[in-house]
Amino acid sequence: MEKDILIELKNVSKKYGENYVIKNLNLFVRRNEFLTFLGPSGCGKTTTLNMIAGFETPDEGNIIFEDSSINIVPPHKRQINTVFQKYALFSHMNVYENVAFGLRIKKLPEKQIREEVEKMLSLVDLKGFEKRSTDSLSGGQQQRVAIARALVNKPKLLLLDEPLGALDLKLRKEMQLELKNIQQKLGITFIFVTHDQEEALTMSDTIVVLNKGTVQQIGTPEDIYNEPKNKFVANFIGVSNILNGVMLHDYKVKFDDETFDCVDTGFNENEDVDVVVRPEDIKIVSKENGKLFGKVISAVFRGVHYEIKVEVKNTTWIIHNTKHVRVGDSIGLDILPDDIHIMRKEKIDEEA
């Protein structure tokens, strides 16, 4: 194992009865990395997290932590802690005692416990809350206590199972940035589980997209968003226009009965492909100047942009633009070569 790799999953599978929840999973996580498992309900992301934590055992394959298999190592003997969506705080203990709990189990000196707890409460911006009851805290404050309690034991890996799911939208956005900031300050590896694409794109160094127990794509947020590997990823990560196309030859693709310049190479001549164009990458121009033109069938204001639907021949295009257009207007559409993404058609189960 390379020095910067903390944990590696090799051919890991998990079955419930005859059904695979995770099948032949291969990936590694680097030290100090923020990695996110992203996918719909039932994709296997929480099961994978539970196998890493030790709450579940793989039926096949190996989980390697710092060069040693931990398949049968019990959870309390792994240098791994977990924060759950339901924070599982001890309501009969105040904030200080909740955070100190793991250190007391280790029977550390009281002076050391106090120093470590104070350091963690300062890190999560809860200094002065030591004597507060956990029941008196807001959801965001309870979240911080749970994170401090998990981190005070100095794990090498922190697992977070949809910990922001119970928070309101504003607080969730704040906590996304705060979690990333904590991870960077401490230099600890985080593995985060979510079905929320925005959370994954905002916080992660690496995203693992899962569907029905198999990896669809592993990459940076930019790679996952801009260069989806298949139709499932393109549909799951944000809004996309996905069309049937034909790759005529390198740098030329045909869709919607028009030929476009693109930047893709390596396809067979006249190969059937899927074409992905993000709504924000479509330019609205005059009907005469557009490569495509059509009629506006809806225009809804979304706050930062209008979501516009345009009927072009037999295709309904979705466009995000700050320009106001009216239903019934005839407009032109233009797409730059860099904004056309070509994917090979794959025989995969793409339904979430």
Swiss-Prot record:
Catalytic activity, as annotated: ATP + H2O + polyamine-[polyamine-binding protein]Side 1 = ADP + phosphate + polyamineSide 2 + [polyamine-binding protein]Side 1
ABC transporter domain spans which residues?
A: 7-237
Q: Which Pfam families match?
A: ABC_tran, TOBE_2
Q: Does the keyword Translocase apply?
A: yes
> Could you tell me which InterPro entries the record lists for this protein?
AAA+_ATPase (IPR003593), ABC_SmlMolc_Importer (IPR050093), ABC_transporter-like_ATP-bd (IPR003439), ABC_transporter-like_CS (IPR017871), Mo/tungstate-bd_C_term_dom (IPR008995), NA-bd_OB-fold (IPR012340), P-loop_NTPase (IPR027417), PotA-like (IPR005893)
Extract the Gene3D superfamilies matched here.
Answer: 2.40.50.100, Nucleic acid-binding proteins, P-loop containing nucleotide triphosphate hydrolases
Keywords per UniProt? ATP-binding, Cell membrane, Membrane, Nucleotide-binding, Translocase, Transport
Q: Which PROSITE patterns match?
A: ABC_TRANSPORTER_1 (PS00211), ABC_TRANSPORTER_2 (PS50893), POTA (PS51305)
Please provide, in alphabetical order, the Gene Ontology terms of the cellular component aspect for this entry.
ATP-binding cassette (ABC) transporter complex
Record localization: Cell membrane
| EC number from the UniProt entry | 7.6.2.11
Top EC class for this record: translocase
Q: Where along the chain is ATP bound?
A: 39-46
Please provide, alphabetically and separated by semicolons, the GO molecular function terms listed in this UniProt record.
ABC-type putrescine transporter activity; ATP binding; ATP hydrolysis activity
What is the protein's membrane topology class? Answer: Peripheral membrane protein
For whether the record's keyword set contains Cell membrane, the answer is yes
Domain of life, per the record?
Bacteria
- Family statement: Belongs to the ABC transporter superfamily. Spermidine/putrescine importer (TC 3.A.1.11.1) family.
Record's subunit section: The complex is composed of two ATP-binding proteins (PotA), two transmembrane proteins (PotB and PotC) and a solute-binding protein (PotD).
What does the UniProt record say this protein does?
A: Part of the ABC transporter complex PotABCD involved in spermidine/putrescine import. Responsible for energy coupling to the transport system.
Q: What is this protein called?
A: Spermidine/putrescine import ATP-binding protein PotA
- Name the species this protein comes from: Clostridium acetobutylicum (strain ATCC 824 / DSM 792 / JCM 1419 / IAM 19013 / LMG 5710 / NBRC 13948 / NRRL B-527 / VKM B-1787 / 2291 / W)
